[in-house]
């Protein structure tokens, strides 16, 4: 698949999963979020990734949220399904369940907690890719998984036909260059770090899977639209205004701050998260509110 494939480029939202005060998924609110991002010009949505609280939803809930997101989108925006797990068999089960869901592809995280070797990581993703025809996007986020997938392993996996790209969330932009060199120019690289996302585009990334996008969707869509055509002056102007927000949305564990911010802006009805995640600490809330004001969102 070409690196210019519009399904996997530009401003991609790591979508929150809205919940009510009882911890149940709020599908009415989810539908409104999908509409909001379509109207704002977002290029794609990731349903039930890390920001969507995949770890505290059952497989059945994961699949239902993804299917409803596809239903609400009505073909107007590509939906990428979070389908990772730290057990290869579970990731395969999830991927198979999504076969006829209408998703554009799957985002699959490096196995967390059990810390596989590079060979184990390779075999994990190879087994998942072999169970489906859906395009697969690898997801490397060692700060959360405890394992770092090396560029050399990515290059091996890039030889598998339906492994088409990676969400690289180390925040080390030199990785973008290294992966492009080893995996080839047609292998899609998406930044997973808002603070360095624009720099990643300058170094050859095709887009960004963004947390900030949840609450600054139009600004983010505009910024990456400018960046991808080389108008970095306009892109930098937007990015400077959002930089405090990029950082403060991680002042506590994601998605705690972004859910509170989305609630503060009226995008969702509740900032509720499922345990063990709890809502944003009261003493931290003014800092995030200040970041929203600096960004021009309040």
UniProtKB/Swiss-Prot annotation:
Alphabetical list of InterPro entries matching this protein = Aldolase_TIM (IPR013785), DapA (IPR005263), DapA-like (IPR002220), Schiff_base-form_aldolases_AS (IPR020625), Schiff_base-form_aldolases_CS (IPR020624)
Q: Which GO terms describe its biological process?
A: diaminopimelate biosynthetic process; lysine biosynthetic process via diaminopimelate
**Keywords associated with the record:** Amino-acid biosynthesis, Cytoplasm, Diaminopimelate biosynthesis, Lyase, Lysine biosynthesis, Schiff base
- Which GO MF terms does the UniProt record name? 4-hydroxy-tetrahydrodipicolinate synthase activity
Q: Under which EC number(s) is this enzyme classified? A: 4.3.3.7
Q: In which pathway does it act?
A: Amino-acid biosynthesis; L-lysine biosynthesis via DAP pathway; (S)-tetrahydrodipicolinate from L-aspartate: step 3/4
Q: Where in the cell is it found?
A: Cytoplasm
Q: Which residues of this protein are annotated with the site description Part of a proton relay during catalysis?
A: 50, 113
What is annotated as the active site?
A: 139 (proton donor/acceptor), 167 (schiff-base intermediate with substrate)
* Residues spanning the membrane: none
Q: What is its main location?
A: cytoplasm
Q: Which residues bind pyruvate?
A: 51, 209
> What Pfam families does the database record attribute to this sequence?
DHDPS
> Its domain of life?
Bacteria
* Class of enzymatic activity (EC top level): lyase
Family from the record: Belongs to the DapA family.
PANTHER family the UniProt entry points to: 4-HYDROXY-2-OXOGLUTARATE ALDOLASE, MITOCHONDRIAL (PTHR12128:SF66), DIHYDRODIPICOLINATE SYNTHASE (PTHR12128)
Q: How does it assemble?
A: Homotetramer; dimer of dimers.
Function of this protein? Catalyzes the condensation of (S)-aspartate-beta-semialdehyde [(S)-ASA] and pyruvate to 4-hydroxy-tetrahydrodipicolinate (HTPA).
Name of the protein this chain belongs to: 4-hydroxy-tetrahydrodipicolinate synthase
Organism equals Haemophilus influenzae (strain PittEE)
Give the classification, highest ranks. Bacteria, Pseudomonadati, Pseudomonadota, Gammaproteobacteria, Pasteurellales
């Amino acid at each position: 698949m070409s690196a210019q494939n519009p399904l996997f480029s530009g401003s991609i939202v790591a979508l929150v999963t809205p919940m009510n005060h009882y911890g149940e998924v709020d599908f009415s609110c989810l539908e409104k979020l999908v509409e909001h991002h379509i109207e704002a010009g977002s290029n794609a949505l990731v349903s039930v990734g890390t920001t969507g609280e995949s770890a505290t939803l059952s497989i059945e809930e994961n699949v239902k949220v993804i299917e409803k997101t596809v239903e609400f989108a009505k073909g107007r925006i590509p939906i990428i399904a979070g389908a990772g797990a730290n057990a290869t068999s579970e990731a395969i089960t999830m991927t198979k369940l999504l076969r006829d869901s209408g998703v554009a592809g799957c985002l699959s995280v490096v196995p967390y907690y059990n810390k596989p070797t590079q060979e184990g990581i390779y075999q994990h993703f190879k087994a998942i890719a072999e169970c489906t025809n859906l395009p697969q996007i690898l997801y490397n986020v060692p700060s959360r998984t405890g394992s770092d997938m090396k560029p050399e392993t990515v290059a091996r996996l890039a030889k598998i036909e339906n492994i088409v790209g990676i969400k690289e969330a180390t925040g080390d932009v030199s990785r973008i260059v290294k992966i492009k060199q080893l995996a080839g120019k047609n292998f899609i690289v998406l930044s997973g770090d808002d603070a360095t996302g624009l720099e990643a585009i300058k170094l050859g990334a095709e887009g960004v899977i963004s947390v900030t996008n949840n609450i600054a969707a139009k600004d983010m869509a505009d910024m990456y639209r400018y960046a991808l055509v080389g108008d970095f002056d306009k892109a930098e102007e937007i990015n400077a205004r959002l930089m405090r927000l990029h950082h403060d949305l991680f002042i506590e564990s994601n998605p705690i701050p972004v859910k509170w911010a989305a609630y503060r802006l009226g995008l969702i009805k509740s900032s509720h998260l499922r345990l063990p995640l709890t809502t944003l600490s009261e003493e931290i809330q003014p800092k995030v509110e200040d970041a929203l004001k600096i960004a021009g969102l309040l």
